[in-house]
Design a protein with these regions (language model features):
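Bacterial Sec-dependent N-terminal signal peptides
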Residues: 1-4, 9-40, 341-343
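Residue-level signature of extracellular beta-strand-rich folds
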Residues: 56-59, 67, 320
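Extracellular beta-strand-rich recognition modules
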Residues: 92-100, 112, 116, 172-182, ...
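Extracellular carbohydrate recognition and processing domains
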Residues: 133-169
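Residue-level recognition of secondary-structure-to-loop junctions
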Residues: 168, 305-312, 316
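Short, solvent-exposed loop/turn segments at the edges of extracellular beta-sandwich modules
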Residues: 183-185, 323-329
């Protein structure tokens, strides 16, 4: 009898492990919309007046629900898209603003130069001397005419705006670079703020796709890193290619690059002159960030409905993605609704 018990124990353990690999419940979700004064049905299409709260009611209890409104940037079918077909693009524009902070006109002279190239070979990123020689000696093209750059400190409200036609570069791999090189320390060496840098591609159907500077994968080349400057001593890691999130003079801060915002910190009057480059990876102008949805339910946040407001007239395909998952398995269902938004 004992022999049979011993044989059963490993069999039971195997069965229990097998159960853990399976989901306790498959994902299930149904979505309905109730008709109201400004919400009606036309066949299988929900018709709603622009600006009217539209409430989706749920049955089923999945662990997670993600909502794709169907608007530009939030289309389920483009959730994995990283490039836009060239034939679908009408125009491509790189835009951003620049303003200097601190210092004066004398310390702003030739402060920043912005470059572009379709032949730059790329940085090694682990051979600092070779990379620094490469960027200094390379035959860059001006992205912005130096005479158009700011000539004195200003403020965000008076930033200089630039828009560059990127349509000629569609399908090409481009590199963008910035060179920060103050020529005077008689006053503070200005902080340079670059705001909202992005490539916007406009499609034939009027929709747009946006690639922010965070996707350019900029790499700093901190040319003064081996000088052991007193106002850079707080930077103890990756001094050659690193950026910072705190105030370190003459070092790039890329923490806002996902929205196109980045800057290089200022230096006090009399401080050693700073010198730094910022170089992107090769950029495909028709690249785009994947569309994304809005998480509206998770295992700690329950909901039986969700309200959304469409602000622009048009037709949309709203998609709800319901998911149950554990570390071994996943179950997912989609529910789609055609939405027509009218004036």
């Amino acid at each position: 009898m004992k022999r049979y018990i011993y044989l059963l124990i490993p069999l039971l353990a195997f069965a229990l492990v097998g159960c853990e690999d399976e989901l306790e419940e498959k994902a299930a979700l149904d979505v309905t919309v109730s008709s109201t004064g400004n919400v009606t049905w036309e066949g299988n299409t929900v018709v709603v007046k622009k600006g009217t709260p539209l409430t989706f009611d749920f049955t089923g209890n999945p662990d997670f629900i993600t909502f794709f409104s169907g608007e530009s940037g939030h289309k389920f079918i483009y959730r994995k898209r990283d490039q836009v077909a060239l034939e679908d693009i009408v125009s491509s524009k790189l835009s951003f603003s620049v303003w200097y902070q601190y210092g004066n006109a004398a310390t702003s002279v030739n402060l920043l130069k912005l470059y572009l190239s379709e032949t730059f070979p790329g940085l090694a990123k682990n051979k600092f001397e070779a990379d620094s020689v490469l960027v200094e000696g390379f035959a860059w093209n001006d992205l912005i005419d130096p005479s158009k750059m700011p000539t004195a400190p200003s403020n965000a409200a008076n930033a200089t705006h630039f828009e560059v036609d990127f349509t000629p570069y569609l399908g090409k791999r481009m590199t963008i670079a910035a060179c920060y090189k103050p020529v005077s320390n008689a006053a503070a060496q200005p902080r340079v703020n670059i705001v909202g840098m992005k490539i916007v591609n406009t499609m034939k159907d009027g929709t747009t796709s946006t690639l922010f500077a965070g996707d350019f994968n900029f790499t700093p080349i901190n040319m003064m890193c081996h000088h052991r400057l007193n106002d850079q001593r707080s930077m103890t890691v990756n001094r050659e290619y690193g950026s910072v999130t705190s105030s370190t003079s003459g070092i790039w801060n890329l923490s806002g690059a996902t929205k196109g915002d980045f800057f290089i910190h200022s230096s006090n009057s009399g401080a050693k002159l700073k010198y730094s480059w910022l170089v992107s990876n090769m950029i495909l102008a028709n690249a785009c960030s994947p569309d994304y949805g809005q998480p509206i339910k998770n295992v700690t946040k329950g909901t039986s409905s969700y309200t959304y407001i469409y602000k622009t007239a048009g037709t949309y395909k709203a998609t709800f993605v319901a998911t149950n998952s554990n570390y071994k398995a996943e179950s997912q269902v989609l529910r789609e609704l055609n939405i027509k938004v009218v004036e």
